[in-house]
């Protein structure tokens, strides 16, 4: 007999269903064989936890809830035999109960005065005399009826048990029982139908497929035991051999005398065999009691899943001393105290005899004691993985020896070029930017890339020295290799931002093939957990963990990493009990012979969590081929004879629209000002009108790119249902007064909330405390409104990472996805929209000749757009070939030198001329003031950036000329510079200037949070020197080049900053950064800098200075302008 859980729709047999209900606390069960819900005969209560089947000796069986049972029977009248979920028998006896309930005469159907024999035959008193075997039947009045009818064992005192009031209950069977069949459902309303479908779709879209059948109730394991130095060496040797490629070596090492006992679970010392489950494990490991919390798990189980293959971790490379999130007073990630020198790959002496009582402290305080996981493996990495040359952060190190991979194609990116500027941490509450401290000594950093106090040196726009060379992989042999590679890159990034969790205990699985294990974490007075949640959420009792939450699980030296997620959790005796499972792409098996102190947990940011979840949802074969980069992408060219909505589209734009309609994957190159927004608008209109397919999802890495498209659609197509979804941090910037305010989801939801819930919403916006009941009611009503609005939208605009939020889980399928600024989207973040359900067409729109995203981990900078073009799987990418933004004098050099003449002007000099401006392209020679170095310190990283006060003074003069002489509004002027320090210095000077800011209005900041790595508020990362901030002074925009990508202004002033005797220009050498800087202006571009330094700093700059000299637009004073 099969049963189905009404809450999660999972179907099991009786035994498995009872385990499921006990662990999840789901309440309602459906009997699929009899087509009915299990409920109380009296009140129809369906809560399985309150129900029990009661047997009155051999007389009758009834199904009652606890409340009805207490009402009907007193203590002395209550029978001793009952079957409930608590004693694990209610579903086992359900079939017998149904048999008794349905019992009637086989001849006439009478339900009363019955008699039964051991063959299961039933006759009433009237029909019994007609049978020739009447003597074999027993009457229901004898008290032995059920023993004979059901074949139960009859005990000696069975007749002494309490008798049921009124005898056996009738009227429950086929002739109309009172509460057996489920009540007739009321007709489902439209609102209820939407809610039901939304819930089912959300649950499906939130599921992580599981390969383990373990849950908290049935888990059988043993406590991870710390090893002594002698045994640790043996385990280390065993683990090393286990990690070698080839047949599984899991059972090797069991021949050790210390471990020679059969089925010794932990494999360390003389531990006895532990035949336990989670309820009777070692007492001090906090066993799981029965009263579990309702976890409502959405992790489906494939009980036939196979164990993981034994293979070497491709990332087992000798690592330098890594940053630790515990601050300056913490131990580093290799387990050495700060101040100790750690030579990569070098063995140091040490043992456990340190005098520390805590084994974890003994390990962390040992001077480089070898991790019990074993020696560093010299195995080569798996095929298809990215290769790293890791720069040393210590005085002495060695490079890892890695053999080239013959089956993959690689390109090498120089980390001294093509690098975006890093981002400073932004305090959202502050209206002004804090100026970094001046550098006290010029040569302070010349100490092997460190300051005197041992902090890492980082120059803005340059990579950390440990990742100075990176070889990216253009193709992968299989999806698991691909996912493993990017998971490790995410781990490297996250450990620069987040702090490790060290205090926990592990229960390893006894089954070698199981991929799940248990982690116990103290709930109370745990400072590590207090850092994971804001104070207001802690006050509401929100747990620090949640189901499906991913983590990085690694050894103390970070040489081995496992990627895990929480399958199920509960809170037991003041501890979080986490049943975690390996993601399916893990290469390493569980290290079940090692103690808890040898590992640490790294929490992930919300962005990284969504990426890892997206990795579990990539199932579309076409997209898998796209990611692996081995098969050519099919391209179909067909003239659809479309009727375009606009007659202003050029030929390249029309071709692009037709290509999208004919192909599942489209790569569209869109140089600056070529009408990408107009092309995307036409694609959306054609998809809706021709295919009636919606919702169409439009995503990008930045909000500005999304807003440009949304504003155009909103203005030109008011009849289309448009929705703009923002991250929580951005919602306050998009009020009703914003141009897009009326289509923003949070504003629409607020207007549709009840008055009481609007009050609660206002409290949460102000950061005020609310009660738990208010929080619950608000969450339910907000979800209901959100589901309805999202389900009815035709076009949804959001960022890549926000596309993985809970709002879009309600969408059953998303037929068309358009990604704008695809080169600014890291490949990791691209996986989020790529993994959405039901995608038929995916459109990448970008320009590989402009800046990509920035990350401290080089692999996370490359976009999927770039990699697809580099590996040659997309043979003929389309390109929009006509620019309409820039004055031809401004666009001439980028067209020739950067776009190789493939781009052309769609405007004339006359169309882009500004009254009174004779030189639309103007270079102002500014060589009198040298650059200054500025330092910003965060945690263990010292970042350097640059400013030039003399250039700032001259730029103020230029702005005044544009304002007063050329009549250019401040809103049409933008000042851009490569360096954040120059941006901040300029902003400070302009804010105090009485001509430019006569009313002394405070500076405003417009920021677009970096949705993936180095987000605003992250501390201690090199990339946090500069985020996507635009300072606005009385309408005038001041920004870095990187943050101004995607923007345009009538006039742009470009401050180059660099002026030194060494002719060094840093990341100004980046061809893409120069391209962005030169292509932001529509009517006039003014470049301020020292032509001599720029000319000698880079070949491309030399060409540009030569071009400017040929055009005779280099001036030493401003009178010519």
UniProtKB/Swiss-Prot annotation:
The protein's enzyme class: hydrolase
Source superkingdom: Eukaryota
Catalytic activity line of the entry: ATP + H2O = ADP + phosphate + H(+)
Chain positions covered by the region annotation Disordered: 157-187, 233-452
Gene3D superfamilies with a match to the protein in the record: P-loop containing nucleotide triphosphate hydrolases (3.40.50.300)
Biased composition (Basic residues): 160-184, 251-263
TM helices/strands, residue ranges: none
GO terms under biological process: nuclear-transcribed mRNA catabolic process, nonsense-mediated decay; regulation of translational termination
Biased composition (Polar residues): 278-287, 376-413
Compartments (UniProt record): Cytoplasm
GO CC, alphabetical: cytoplasm; cytoplasmic stress granule
Biased composition (Basic and acidic residues): 307-316, 342-363, 426-452
Chief place of localization: cytoplasm
Pfam families: AAA_11, AAA_12
Keywords: ATP-binding, Cytoplasm, DNA-binding, Helicase, Hydrolase, Nucleotide-binding, Phosphoprotein, RNA-binding
EC number: 3.6.4.13
Biased composition, class Low complexity, residue ranges: 323-336
Effects seen without this gene: Sensitivity to drugs that affect translation fidelity. Overexpression results in a nonsense suppression phenotype.
Modified residues (Phosphoserine): 227, 392
GO molecular function terms listed in the Swiss-Prot or TrEMBL record: ATP binding; ATP hydrolysis activity; DNA binding; DNA helicase activity; mRNA binding; RNA binding; RNA helicase activity
Binding site for ATP: 670-677
Additional note from the record: Present with 736 molecules/cell in log phase SD medium.
Function: Probable RNA helicase, which may be involved in modulation of the translation termination process. Probably unwinds double-stranded RNA. In vitro, unwinds covalently closed, circular DNA in the presence of a DNA topoisomerase TOP1 and replication factor-A protein RFA1.
Subunit structure of this chain's protein: Interacts with the peptidyl release factors SUP35 and weakly with SUP45.
Record-stated family: Belongs to the DNA2/NAM7 helicase family.
Protein name per UniProt: Putative ATP-dependent RNA helicase ECM32
Provenance organism: Saccharomyces cerevisiae (strain ATCC 204508 / S288c) (Baker's yeast)
